């Protein structure tokens, strides 16, 4: 009986979340890793003015409750950024809720 009670306490699942790193850490990661996506969640106009080379643009406002065709692999490493860090945090939270498992928020550029 005691064993059953104790095993029930250990079944709580960890809350799904994203990681935050600095831009410097992200630069190092981009130099060392492969197979990642850089996601710019600013507006299309902001993206057209300046963006990290190789980044794809999906505006934070367009990330909702449906799967994103541009991001088919929910386990792929995705580095998320915006201008100041606010929208990248919001987008990262939404991506986690959509089931993405490897989100890293790198703030603003």
Task: Locate the predicted segments by residue.
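Catalytic cysteine-centered active loop of the rhodanese-like fold, especially the PTP/DSP P-loop
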Residues: 68-109
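Extracytoplasmic
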Residues: 33-34, 42, 52-53, 73-77, ...
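N-terminal, post-signal-peptide region of Sec/Tat-exported proteins
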Residues: 39-66
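Structured segments of extracytoplasmic/periplasmic soluble domains
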Residues: 29-33, 44, 61, 81, ...
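Mobile, glycine- and charge-enriched loop segments
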Residues: 30-31, 36, 61-80
């Amino acid at each position: 009986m005691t064993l059953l009670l104790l095993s029930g306490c250990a079944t709580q699942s960890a809350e799904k979340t994203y990681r935050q790193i600095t831009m410097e850490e992200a630069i190092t990661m981009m130099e060392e890793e492969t197979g990642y996506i850089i996601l710019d969640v600013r507006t299309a106009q902001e993206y057209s003015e300046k963006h990290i080379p190789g980044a794809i643009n999906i505006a934070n406002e367009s990330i909702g409750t449906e799967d994103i065709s541009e991001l088919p692999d929910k386990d792929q490493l995705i580095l998320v950024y915006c201008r100041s860090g606010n929208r990248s945090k919001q987008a990262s939270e939404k991506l986690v809720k959509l089931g993405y498992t490897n989100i890293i928020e790198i703030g603003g550029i």
